Every structure is written in C-alpha cells, then in structure tokens.
From Swiss-Prot:
GO biological process: proton transmembrane transport; sodium ion transport
Lineage: Bacteria, Bacillati, Bacillota, Bacilli, Bacillales
Top-rank taxon: Bacteria
Protein name from the UniProt record: Na(+)/H(+) antiporter subunit C1
Species for this entry: Staphylococcus saprophyticus subsp. saprophyticus (strain ATCC 15305 / DSM 20229 / NCIMB 8711 / NCTC 7292 / S-41)
Cell compartment(s), UniProt: Cell membrane
Amino acid sequence: MEILMIFVCGILTAMSVYLILSKSLIRIIIGTTLQTHTANLFLITMGGLKKGEVPIYEKGITSYVDPIPQALILTAIVISFSVTAFFLVLAFRSYKELGTDNVESMKGVLEDDRE
C-alpha cells in the first residue's frame, strides 16, 4: 500500500508543479494548496499505514501507532489553511486593483503608474 501511495504523491506533485508554473494567480494558489496536501499525504505514508492502538500504555497491547506524523500533519493543515486564506485575499485584492489575474501582465503595472 505504501508503494501505491508514493506513486500517488508523485502524480500529485507533478500536477501541483504544473499548476504553480502557470500564469493564472488562482491556478498558482491551487497548486500550492495541492502541494501542501501532497506533503501531508507523504508524511502519513512515511509514518506507516499500519493498524495499531492509541499510544497510551495498557497491558497486552504490543502495536502502537506513531503519533509524531499525525501531530505534524495537524499543524501543517492549520498553517496551510491560513496561508491559503492569505493568498486568496491577496489574489482578490490584486484582481480588484489591477483587473487581471495573469501574473505576467501584473509585472510592470505599478511601475508604469508612477511615471
């Protein structure tokens, strides 16, 4: 199962790189969000996709699940949510100001307005 998940992570990484390299600001935001989800999936996969009990000491339980990847992913989800919200607000504001979401046409707009 871990091998299959690694291939899925590779495909998702390729998709996110394709979106990040596009010219639309919304596609770039979707690509970065997809990349963070891919990193979370990779961490879960490397933590082990095995069945086990909660890591609380009880007699008779020999197989525990590692809690560190789960804690890292929970933190990463919160951080990626806040970064995505910031990027969406930034994209909305730049669209309202500049009238486009094309990154290449945004390049010299502010410099041309100053002259």
